[in-house]
Amino acid sequence: MNIRPLHDRVIIKREEVETRSAGGIVLTGSAATKSTRAKVLAVGKGRILENGTVQPLDVKVGDIVIFNDGYGVKSEKIDGEEVLIISENDILAIVE
């Protein structure tokens, strides 16, 4: 992937969601919800603080994160893959 996010932006790829229920029923439409887990593909250099210093991000490439899938999440196709560009503020947790 040939893209570098700026500042506190993070590029993530959403994890695939199981499309079958525990009972084996295939889920479609609104029943098949999108995952809010994703793998971090790239990170910016950090948030620029009021005093001009750069605060590094807490997430790093390869982390699995849980994110807020709402306003401010930008979807793009890069190298044929759908990725999301989000602010680090939209990341709720790192899965360890």
UniProtKB/Swiss-Prot annotation:
SUPFAM superfamilies: GroES-like. It is found in: Cytoplasm. One of its GO terms (cellular component) is cytoplasm. One of its GO terms (biological process) is chaperone cofactor-dependent protein refolding. Keywords: Chaperone, Cytoplasm, Stress response. InterPro entries: Chaperonin_GroES (IPR020818), Chaperonin_GroES_sf (IPR037124), Chaprnonin_Cpn10_CS (IPR018369), GroES-like_sf (IPR011032). GO terms for molecular function: ATP binding; metal ion binding; protein folding chaperone; protein-folding chaperone binding; unfolded protein binding. It comes from the Bacteria. Pfam families: Cpn10. Its main location: cytoplasm. Belongs to the GroES chaperonin family. Heptamer of 7 subunits arranged in a ring. Interacts with the chaperonin GroEL. Together with the chaperonin GroEL, plays an essential role in assisting protein folding. The GroEL-GroES system forms a nano-cage that allows encapsulation of the non-native substrate proteins and provides a physical environment optimized to promote and accelerate protein folding. GroES binds to the apical surface of the GroEL ring, thereby capping the opening of the GroEL channel. This is Co-chaperonin GroES. It comes from Haemophilus influenzae (strain ATCC 51907 / DSM 11121 / KW20 / Rd).
